[in-house]
Amino acid sequence: MAPGEIIGPNVTRLRVDRELSQAVLAERAGISRISLGKIERGETIPRAKTLFALARALRASAADLVTPVEPLSRVRFRAARRVNSREQILAETSAWLSAYSWLEKELGQERHFKLQDLVGSSAAPAELAARAREGLGVGPREPVRDICGLLEDNGLKMLLLEKASDLFFGLSVGPADGGPALVVNTWERISVERWIFTAVHELGHILMHLDAFDRRQTDENVDEERQADRFASHFLMPEGVFEDEWRESGGLSFVERVFKVKRIFRVSYKTVLYRLRESGRMGSDVFAIFQAQYKRLAGRTLKKVDEPQALAEGEFRFNWSSAAELGDSLSKYDFVEDRLSRLVREALEKEVISLGRAAEILALPMTEMRELAGTWVQ
């Protein structure tokens, strides 16, 4: 591949991701818009000075501009609306997956996907969720405490990306491209409960819809999304246990009851409401009823990104006087992938990779990589 065919698409992809027009990027890099256009089309190869200027303007490294991106083909990345950073997310996923797979092979730590026998199953989402829990060693009444650790220990690779977008929650990659792998958007404005749900939702796609993984497909398939939602809901809240908890909390107000059950299963309040509607316990107006009762108690309605704090364990009353200070009921430490970091540490200690390569794989500046390595203990 000619240099221009690598640099041009990389510059364009990063520019779109940074939401910069050609005119703005050209001005920041000190070149004309016409020159930038030629670079992006691959008609001109920028000189070193221009290359570094473009990298600075794009908040990237020169290596980011000259390194070819291995395209993913068997990937599911769909959204109801266009995600401008789509190509950059796919590029970052490709680079991460390539490094991850290489490390596993070099260290002899490749893992078999424990749920491979369930891929392509025709079972209903709820039944498949029960079988998946069993296959991962999760008891029928056991809550899922560490979803990242559970999935990574059983052969799934996980990448946590922080993208300032409420249009992108996650994607999944098939085995043909180095997967199965999941990518979850851990932007701070998305609740931890949503991160957890997204991970299991994408697992559902891998088990049920792998034959539909196609990079070229960008529009959501409503039926497949609903199936993945049902799978995630029943994986995190098995119906039998949910029924018991819902019945036992029957003396609480509707809102308090939802919050208590939400806290037990570590899911969003919306997941509980969907289950109530799906199971026929309540009708299609369940969300309107919840919002109306919440407003009477808290003095405000919940916005799209709000995830109110649930009742503390063993608590039967909610402190409505502090409702304005509600935050996520789970912290970011409830959703941490750490297998790649462990592989990087082992590779460093065995001198398989350099500190610079370790920083590159973990997407850390060298100073932060040195600090991290300095904190490692036995």
PLM feature segments, named:
Residues M1-Q378:
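Active-site hotspot residues in diverse enzymes, especially metal/ion-binding acidic/histidine motifs
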